[in-house]
């Protein structure tokens, strides 16, 4: 008997908006366990960003996406990468994640909400709302989260093992965000 693929979840837009908040929970978890000495530390002889710079950038880029793609949403204040503290960064990231989640919910709604296109920057062509928008937003955060983890490690401030593994505990992260983990049909079959 041929395998029939499962139908997409009817709650897919809501689940994608929630997944963005779970993604930010990973940022929060990283910052909760980051040694404070790593926040502004620099590698000797390097001109790269500090961890403070990285997370200020993540937040400020989210604000740019919101300003360009969802101007009807109230923007959180931008972060000054030279002055922000880890506590301020955590609060700002939480605020911009909520706004980005709201933007995704509107962009993916049927019928569509007020978000008609996704603009990454003034130079970039607009994208229609959808999977590419969601993937780009998640990938941007994940890329910079990886940079921060690697930089902390290189600086000698490696995350505690349990914190590093917790970044991959999706079931627990979903629950920490107050969401019910999406479930699908049980199958022992490999993807074909």
Give short role names for the model-derived ranges.
Residues 1-12:
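Short, contiguous pre-domain boundary segments
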Residues 2-3, 17-31, 38-81, 118-187, ...:
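Short, contiguous alpha-helical
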Residues 8, 19-23, 92-96:
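Soluble or luminal CAZymes and related metallo-dependent hydrolases
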Residues 10-17, 86-90, 134-138:
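Active-site rim elements
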Residues 10-15, 48-58, 99-107:
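Short, mixed-charge, low-aromatic patches
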Residues 34-38, 106-109:
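Short, solvent-exposed, charged loop/turn and helix-capping segments
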Residues 67-109:
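Helix-adjacent hinge/juxtasegments
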Residues 106-123:
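Acidic catalytic patch
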